[in-house]
Amino acid sequence: MSKKFFAIQIILILSFVGCGDKNDYVGDLNNELPDGKGIMTYEDGSKYDGEWKEGKRYGEGTLTFEDGAKYEGEWKNGEMDGTGEFTWSNGDKYEGEWKNGKKNGQGTIFYHDGSKLEGEFRDDSPWDTSLYDK
């Protein structure tokens, strides 16, 4: 077997295997990157269904995690950014503003026991909030 033939076989095998990338994408592409509407299923079991720009989550979309947690809302540069709702697998839910993937701005956490934490969040932490019992 010639070296050239062997090299071509290796290239074909790597292109089918994907060089270890086990994410699965179905949707619009531009320059071989997700761009437009599409669904990405990640190796860890999470799944994003929404808009893409230059290979990053951008616009409106939903990210569902394997444990059942889910974010629905706005994205920018691959991060939760804008208005969105995050629901943890235990039923607690945050509704409000996000910046660079963190709770930032006005929002409310609704706890599964009926209580809620409402007010301003900064850098993913409560800043000026009030806790209300059920």
For each predicted feature, which ranges?
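N-terminal secretory signal peptides that target proteins for export/translocation
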Residues: 1-2
